[in-house]
């Protein structure tokens, strides 16, 4: 097996091949003279040809593909020989053909010696020769010093043969094979020895003027690139892969090109001929086929993404609204010129320009006819005279615009306002506008079903509680009320009841429907297809993952993109892989956003409407009672009964302590669920206030299990460490939660980098709550602050919440407080009208009527909690999964957490 050749050997072999071809050209040039001289001149030449013919006709010689060689002109305008080394090494020279001293491919594998460095003057001399020694052919080195050889050498003829020829007629198109001719094959085998680029090809190019500069259109040439880099005004465009220069460097470039023997440039005036070392041949017309597409970049303009073409540039310059962006190097036009541009581009044979998608042209049909400079379409103000006056008068200006937008879209839209902008109240108002088409179906995450119930009762006084049906188990009736509220999970279990169509449907956290393969999506999509009004709510539309938006888009407007593949190609950067199509990417996001906002989507950020928002937005969140375990409910009932008995004042306080602690135990699963849902919804930084240690412990345990960064400040935190923990929170990035004690961290600390505060528990002193709220509502806060109070029915919250409101009202009348919970908080009147409620409320009020008793009660509460850690509260320290599994009468053995984003959507910020 032959050893691989070194780079030097390959180079010398290539030189030898060129020289052998030169000798053959010399021999062929002598043949016509021999034929003209007749038999008188046929002496040695005739004998040589006879020897060659005898050799070619001899059948006993071994024949391999090494015996095939091509007669070709030595023009540098064509690629050098690209045959494999084995073939080139075994090609016979003219001397070898006449003497018969040439070898087949197998023999030549050992007949090619390693070349020694040649002197500089020997570049045009044969490298390999053969001499006979003792009857055997041997490879010898011939430096050209002697004139020995079968043919006399003519230096002038060799130089002429070595010069590149520009005539195509001198090129032979035949292969000579042993025994005769065979037609030339189409392809040429690759040159496996040519590992480095060689500038042996002749390049032709042209200079093209573009404004005050000119660019050079030509192929790659190493020497030419060096010339380009020597010019000070050079600039390389990586997109078009061309060089351009200032006109001041034009003459210098042309002079430098004249010194290059393998490059020809057509001057700018196109009349001076080619500039270069060779005479230029007429170049064939360019057959470059360019393709491009149109993309929407604003409500009034579109952009063209296409490769360079002089014809296309000429077409662009015919458009009156043309505009060229120097940064992106793209042209844009008004929408009203879209159809004209597409029509004229079809007249260009080598250009294919794809128009805007049909969905886009339909959505912007008015702009295509006559482009309006307005950045937003005019939305007529809706007539809301048929909606409850309390609701209409409470709407902020931007919320009123949202309702009008929905009605202008005939009640089918995706409301994607930022968190905290009141999507719930807007959705209720939109649904109330179509009240004649009720019953209404509201599909929401399970933990906020009762929050929606309270919102309907608050904003629609004309709606009686009996007309609201909250489905809590899989056995409930989905059509029992005028307003039917159900969770996503229960909707899947009630598919049999969905035969009765709902004309008006609200889907809260509609991004739950991102995957068509999920059970909740399969259950919801048929409802949305037959519904007349579809109101989707989502605080964080997945604009970066367009594939997750597709289900929501077709739910609102089924005719938008009937086929997902077309949507995926345009907006998901679809790629075909060996196992199928990949739609996980994104493309043309700007166009998609403009399209959705024009047709179905309304999205406002807090920064857009900050001037209309109050400094604080309070929201009372009614947690899911299904999360409270039966054991906790029994303990609460027992504690409530104890409070109604005749007791001394000290015994009453002890009963209150028991009730207060049982409430903390019962709310643990609800609080943990809410915190995790906030994190999954995209909330990154917020505060969680609680009084009982068991709640802080439970939340901290879940955060650690989820690997969520958090800090904790309670009564056991040293004073020196509190400020350090605060700074850690302020400077942190990403998801961070601050777990804070209501009494230990309600003053002296600043958490202005957060704009959300969650109170896991209520406190009987509203002044302490307001101080805790102000940890984020401080100097340096640039956003509207959201305050969420988590309350649970059937617990101490039933009595603490009205007590807090009463105290705030008294302080406000005395001018000691500017806060009004009743007017600034959603869903305040949630409390059950229980006969024993008045007695318990009075007991709370009597116990806390004097603020001086607060500290005594706090100390007693803390002592009670510490003393009960080995008893009752031992039940709390059990695995949280046991507390969270009991839900809706059907306890599956898995986590029942719902993951959704925009808890602020349930509030009406007033």
From Swiss-Prot:
GO CC term, one of those recorded: nucleus
Top EC class for this record: hydrolase
Main location: nucleus
Tissue occurrence: Ubiquitously expressed, with high levels in brain, heart, kidney, liver and testis.
Keyword Disulfide bond: no
Domain HARP: 199-269, 286-357
Protein EC: 3.6.4.-
Record field: compositional bias (Basic and acidic residues): 7-29
Localization (cell): Nucleus
GO MF terms, alphabetically ordered: ATP binding; ATP-dependent activity, acting on DNA; ATP-dependent DNA/DNA annealing activity; helicase activity; hydrolase activity
Domain Helicase ATP-binding, first and last residues per copy: 404-559
Motif, DESH box: chain positions: 508-511
Subunit structure: Interacts with RPA2; the interaction is direct and mediates the recruitment by the RPA complex of SMARCAL1 to sites of DNA damage.
Family, per entry: Belongs to the SNF2/RAD54 helicase family. SMARCAL1 subfamily.
Protein name (Swiss-Prot/TrEMBL): SWI/SNF-related matrix-associated actin-dependent regulator of chromatin subfamily A-like protein 1
Natural source organism: Mus musculus (Mouse)
Phylogenetic placement of the source organism: Eukaryota, Metazoa, Chordata, Craniata, Vertebrata
């Amino acid at each position: 097996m032959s050893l691989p050749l070194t780079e030097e050997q390959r180079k010398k072999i290539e030189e030898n091949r060129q020289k052998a071809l030169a000798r053959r050209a010399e021999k062929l040039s002598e043949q016509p003279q021999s034929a003209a001289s007749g038999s008188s001149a046929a002496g040695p030449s005739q004998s040589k040809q006879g020897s060659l013919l005898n050799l070619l006709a001899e059948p006993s010689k071994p024949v391999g593909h090494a015996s095939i060689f091509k007669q070709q002109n030595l023009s540098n305008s064509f690629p050098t020989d690209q045959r494999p080394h084995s073939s080139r090494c075994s090609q016979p020279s003219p001397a070898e053909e006449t003497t018969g001293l040439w070898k087949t491919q197998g023999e030549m594998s050992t007949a090619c010696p390693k070349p020694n460095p040649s002197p500089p003057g020997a570049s045009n001399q044969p490298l390999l020769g053969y001499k006979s020694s003792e009857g055997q052919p041997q490879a010898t080195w011939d430096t050209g010093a002697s004139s020995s050889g079968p043919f006399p050498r003519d230096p002038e003829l060799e130089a002429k043969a070595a010069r590149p020829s520009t005539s195509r007629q001198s090129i032979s198109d035949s292969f000579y094979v042993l025994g005769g001719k065979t037609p030339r094959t189409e392809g040429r085998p690759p040159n496996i020895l040519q590992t480095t680029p060689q500038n042996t090809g002749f390049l032709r190019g042209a200079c093209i003027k573009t404004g005050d500069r000119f660019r050079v259109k030509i192929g790659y040439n190493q020497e030419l690139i060096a010339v380009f880099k020597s010019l000070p005004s050079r600039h390389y465009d990586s997109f078009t892969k061309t060089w351009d220069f200032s006109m001041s460097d034009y003459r210098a470039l042309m002079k430098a090109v004249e010194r290059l023997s393998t490059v020809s440039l057509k001057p700018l005036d196109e009349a001076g001929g080619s500039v270069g070392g060779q005479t230029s041949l007429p170049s064939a017309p360019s057959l470059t086929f360019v393709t491009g597409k149109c993309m929407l970049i604003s409500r009034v303009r579109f952009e063209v993404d296409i490769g360079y073409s002089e014809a296309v540039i000429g077409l662009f310059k015919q458009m009156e609204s043309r505009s060229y962006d120097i940064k992106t190097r793209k042209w844009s036009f008004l929408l009203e010129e879209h159809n004209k541009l597409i029509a004229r581009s079809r007249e260009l044979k080598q250009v294919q320009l794809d128009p805007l998608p049909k969905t886009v042209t339909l959505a912007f049909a008015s702009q295509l006819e006559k482009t309006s400079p307005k950045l937003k379409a005019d939305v007529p103000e809706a007539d809301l005279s048929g909606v409850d006056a309390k609701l209409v008068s409470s709407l902020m200006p931007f919320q009123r615009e949202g309702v009008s937008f929905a009605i202008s879209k005939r009640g089918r839209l995706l409301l994607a306002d930022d968190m905290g902008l009141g999507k719930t109240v807007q959705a209720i108002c939109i649904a109330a506008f179509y009240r004649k088409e009720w019953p209404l179906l509201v599909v929401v995450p399970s933990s906020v079903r009762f929050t929606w119930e309270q919102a309907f009762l608050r904003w629609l006084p004309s709606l009686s509680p009996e007309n609201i049906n909250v489905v809590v188990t899989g056995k409930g009736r989905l059509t029992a009320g005028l307003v039917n509220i159900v969770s996503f999970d229960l909707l899947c279990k009630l598919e049999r009841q969905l035969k009765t169509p709902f004309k008006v449907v609200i889907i809260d956290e509609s991004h739950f429907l991102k995957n068509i393969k999920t059970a909740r999506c399969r259950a919801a999509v048929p409802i949305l297809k037959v519904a007349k009004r579809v109101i989707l709510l989502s605080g964080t539309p997945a604009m970066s993952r367009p594939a997750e938006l597709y289900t929501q888009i077709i739910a609102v407007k089924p005719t938008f993109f009937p086929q997902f593949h077309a949507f995926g190609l345009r907006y998901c950067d679809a790629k075909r892989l060996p196992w199928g199509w990949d739609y996980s990417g994104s493309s043309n996001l700007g166009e998609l956003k403009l399209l959705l906002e024009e047709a179905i989507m309304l999205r406002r950020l807090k920064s857009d409407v900050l001037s209309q928002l109050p400094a604080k937005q309070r929201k009372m969140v009614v947690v899911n009672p299904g999360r409270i375990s039966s054991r906790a409910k029994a303990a609460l009932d027992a504690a409530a009964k104890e409070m109604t008995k005749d007791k001394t004042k000290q015994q009453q306080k002890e009963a209150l302590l028991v009730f207060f602690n049982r409430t903390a135990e019962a709310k643990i699963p609800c609080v943990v669920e809410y915190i995790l849902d906030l994190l999954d919804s995209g909330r990154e930084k917020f505060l969680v206030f609680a009084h009982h240690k068991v709640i802080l412990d439970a939340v901290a345990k879940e955060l650690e299990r989820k690997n969520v960064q958090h800090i904790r400040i309670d009564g056991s935190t040293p004073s020196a460490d509190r400020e350090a923990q605060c700074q850690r929170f302020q400077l942190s990035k990403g998801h961070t939660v601050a777990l804070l004690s209501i009494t230990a961290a309600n003053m002296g600390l600043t958490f202005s980098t957060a704009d959300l505060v969650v109170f896991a528990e209520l406190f009987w002193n509203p002044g302490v709550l307001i101080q805790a709220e102000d940890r984020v509502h401080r100097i340096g806060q640039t956003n509207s602050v959201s305050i969420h109070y988590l309350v649970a029915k059937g617990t101490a919250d039933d009595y603490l919440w009205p007590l807090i409101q009463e105290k705030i009202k008294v302080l406000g009348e005395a001018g000691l407080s500017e806060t009004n919970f009743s007017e600034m908080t959603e869903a305040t009147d949630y409390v059950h009208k229980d006969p024993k409620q008045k007695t318990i409320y009075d007991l709370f009020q009597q116990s806390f009527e004097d603020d001086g008793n607060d500290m005594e009660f706090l100390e007693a509460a803390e002592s009670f909690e510490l003393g009960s850690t080995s008893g009752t509260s031992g039940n709390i320290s059990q695995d949280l999964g046991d507390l969270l599994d009991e839900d809706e009468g059907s306890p599956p053995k898995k986590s029942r957490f719902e993951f959704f984003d925009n808890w602020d959507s349930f509030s009406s910020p007033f």
